[in-house]
Curated annotation (Swiss-Prot):
Protein name: Acyl-CoA 6-desaturase
Positions occupied by motif Histidine box-1: 180-184
Signal peptide coordinates: none
Record topology, Cytoplasmic segments: 1-130, 179-264, 327-444
Cellular localisation: Endoplasmic reticulum membrane; Microsome membrane
Encoding gene, per UniProt annotation: Fads2
Keyword RNA-binding carried by entry: no
UniProt-recorded Gene Ontology molecular function terms: acyl-CoA 6-desaturase activity; omega-6 fatty acid desaturase activity; oxidoreductase activity, acting on paired donors, with oxidation of a pair of donors resulting in the reduction of molecular oxygen to two molecules of water; stearoyl-CoA 9-desaturase activity
Family of this protein: Belongs to the fatty acid desaturase type 1 family.
Record lineage: Eukaryota, Metazoa, Chordata, Craniata, Vertebrata
Documented EC number(s): 1.14.19.3
Length: 444
């Protein structure tokens, strides 16, 4: 009988071979209307599904045409569950002769990093100490209570008002670090519980939006300090950052502001205004524009609670001024802490590095101490946090020595500095970029 002789009733039909692709072809599919990415050598067409991605379409788009294996593993807790959403998107796999990684990604560094992550799992460093996070939440609520007590007992004079504002700004800053933990799914094993508590902390305790934060912050983690991909370095022409941007602006004779003085006007419009003006407006408009009624309801619950508590002391207008004074104080704290780890590092176009190398190029650490840990929400361990975003922050210091060893092995710089030095480097970095702009503006 011929080849079809054994294909009859009850026989198993041979499965068609999976299409194979070369990196040269995959890299062409990096447009908003045409997105492919690779995970564990499997090729997925995520063009349409990216619009339904819970983390937003942009974070997927940033990896279009690339291997996204380590980013995929870093951001998701239950890989088997999220893997179910990938199955319908599978269109093929890498050709056998193709390397698993594309472009400038190092296979040896990647292999060592994955071994390091396995070591961290074996050390139970992804296991949460729930008492730690309970105490963090408790001390935030205690500060809220102390603030009300001060005004109730001492009245609304200038001194009690200023003290209360500092207490509430501290509470807001700490709530900001805490929502960051839940937003990164680093507290509970189940994503759903992290999402629920995240909405409570960022919404009811801070008046912000969980979805706005997710869509923005995960882009930053996926492509830190990469122009056109990391929203945290989108400075709206107010600052020029790194080396590439000031040179581009200078050569094109772009002068929206006197950037050679940006290290001076930073003190006037950076720390004071980011939260009370830019973030507060952007968050509210984003929730309304996207019709995110759930997050809006959570935010309204914060404002309702705040004004219900403080209108009796200050009246409507006074309570509004009081709120923005608190935001003003918190904004200084937030800006200095978040910028000390990134703005001083490499800021450039995408070089398509492997996960480990890209995170080390864009992040640095601040020395550990009890105060530094508390003050920064453990973001003094920014390197480890960026490498392992779902690792509970109380374990970051435990993996740090192993990260240092891996850096030393591959000749990658591991930067760690004192807190004051880290803060001063922000200003010196802005000054350096401003000088680069001025030189290019005048002479190129």
């Amino acid at each position: 009988m011929g080849k079809g002789g054994n294909q009859g009733e009850g026989s198993t039909e041979l499965q068609a071979p999976m299409p194979t692709f070369r990196w040269e072809e995959i890299q062409k599919h990096n447009l908003r209307t045409d997105r492919w990415l690779v995970i564990d050598r499997k090729v997925y067409n995520v063009t349409k599904w990216s619009q339904r991605h819970p983390g937003g379409h942009r974070v997927i788009g940033h990896y279009s045409g690339e291997d996204a294996t380590d980013a995929f593993r870093a951001f998701h807790l239950d890989l088997d569950f999220v893997g179910k959403f990938l199955k319908p998107l599978l269109i093929g796999e890498l050709a056998p002769e193709e390397p698993s990684l594309d472009r400038g990604k190092s296979s040896q560094i990647t292999e060592d990093f994955r071994a390091l992550k396995k070591t961290a799992e074996d050390m139970n460093l992804f296991k949460t100490n729930h008492l730690f996070f309970f105490l963090l939440l408790s001390h935030i609520i205690v500060m809220e209570s102390i603030a009300w007590f001060i005004l109730s007992y001492f009245g609304n004079g200038w001194i009690p008002t200023v003290i209360t504002a500092f207490v509430l700004a501290t509470s807001q800053a700490q709530a900001g670090w805490l929502q960051h933990d839940y937003g990164h799914l680093s507290v509970y094993k189940k994503s759903i519980w992290n999402h629920i508590v995240h909405k409570f902390v960022i919404g009811h305790l801070k008046g912000a939006s969980a979805n706005w934060w997710n869509h923005r912050h995960f882009q930053h983690h996926a492509k830190p300090n990469i122009f056109h991909k990391d929203p945290d370095i989108k400075s709206l022409h107010v600052f020029v950052l790194g080396e590439w941007q000031p040179l581009e602006y200078g050569k094109k004779k772009l002068k929206y502001l006197p950037y050679n003085h940006q290290h001076e006007y930073f003190f006037l419009i950076g720390p004071p205004l980011l939260i009370p003006m830019y973030f507060q407006y952007q968050i509210i408009m984003t929730m309304i524009r996207r019709r995110d009624w759930v997050d809006l309801a959570w935010a309204i619950s914060y404002y309702a609670r705040f004004f219900y508590t403080y209108i009796p002391f200050y009246g409507i207008l006074g309570a509004l001024v009081f709120l923005n004074f608190i935001r003003f104080l918190e904004s200084h704290w937030f800006v200095w802490v978040t910028q000390m780890n990134h703005i001083v590092m490499e800021i450039d176009l995408d070089h398509y590095r492997d996960w480990f190398s890209s995170q080390l190029a864009a992040t640095c650490n601040v020395e550990q101490s009890f105060f530094n840990d508390w003050f920064s929400g453990h973001l003094n361990f920014q390197i480890e946090h960026h490498l392992f975003p779902t690792m509970p922050r109380h374990n970051l210091h435990k993996i740090a020595p192993l990260v240092k060893s891996l850096c030393a092995k591959h000749g990658i710089e591991y930067q760690e500095k004192p807190l004051l030095r880290a803060l001063l480097d922000i200003v010196s970095s802005l000054k350096k970029s401003g000088e680069l702009w001025l030189d290019a503006y005048l002479h190129k």
